[in-house]
């Protein structure tokens, strides 16, 4: 089945893919393309509407991103968000100027008129502003449909041409009813229906895998996390014993993780192959302190290990990975100019010397969609609800060089923190929780003795997709329990701190 999409043009906002996720959450399929996508390629997708994303630049900048203006002649409904609004205003003859008061943060949206894009939402709702330029005069044919304290044109529309524009970001978590606004655009302005769901996605992926693989075999990288487990299950559904699932113990796993992974797959009747490559990984990481180099080394070593394992089996032509949409957007601008944050170990394709063709069935879906897909495939909720764990493992939760003593220290602290969260019911209330070994020592007193030991940081965040996150407001008594237990039970740690940074500006992981 071909899904008729809403096409999102990416002008460089780190929030672009959240727009797509919010639409899919409403059952509306969406695709993201670069801002300069050829008009013919856009038309070939037969979209029901177009959204122009936000972006980091000014429309008047020398290197400003501009789309093919033919999009405005297609007769399709269009929604511009922030930078997208300024592009629309500029194109149709309005004026855009630097704002006298930059508007960053929450604002109250006041409706000026009734409009279907506001259907079932509250006047006075809180929205998220993040802009330096603003529309001074709106183009002919447009009317203001909402304002805020610092934005006389917080939302505008040309009703006759079905062109809408928001100065705020409806897609981000802080916009109270932003999801409804996007849903209203898709359903009431574009006429989309709710046909996108993980049941149909699973069927489509199974057929695509079968068509692509034929009678060949697929080597599947398994970590035991949600993503790789869903990939392995999807492959097993599609091609049965043609999938060869391989779990690599890289020495960077959490406490008891190898045993848990092996038990889980055995209970599902999957013949999991375990490769102990911990010494290989740790030897290659010796002396390396740069986080980007650590990620690259781990990614390259994974590929080498899989290549060795593949040679033990005949007929393998494919390698499967659990790459997600968020991995892609944070690694490389494959769909637009969004700025690179960090590389991911499973993104960027395979080296030229490797003979495998890559299969990434989750590459275009988000974490919440992966969990829904896992439940659709019959995986247990206990596994589906596990917190995300990065491919590079504990290597990027140790600041500086990675070695066995520090890994053991971090594992012990992590076990205690997770135990407290599970026992208090906060594990399932948060998106991700972990500890970071800072490799910063400080003076302390234990008993009558002076100590000079390590500092551990506790990082707990709330999120829905990992693209944005806020630090979790854990009760102080629970944080106190975590701190007291770690300091009392783990030799070598005398200080525990709590990370209260949100994303952005910080990333969730420290490296």
UniProtKB/Swiss-Prot annotation:
Question: Which stretch is the leader sequence?
Answer: none
One GO cellular component, as annotated: cytosol
Keyword ATP-binding listed = yes
Q: Which CDD domains match?
A: GATase1_GMP_Synthase (cd01742), GMP_synthase_C (cd01997)
Which reaction(s) does its UniProt entry say it catalyses? XMP + L-glutamine + ATP + H2O = GMP + L-glutamate + AMP + diphosphate + 2 H(+)
Protein role: Catalyzes the synthesis of GMP from XMP.
Q: Please give the name of this protein.
A: GMP synthase [glutamine-hydrolyzing]
**What lineage is on file?**
Bacteria, Pseudomonadati, Campylobacterota, Epsilonproteobacteria, Campylobacterales
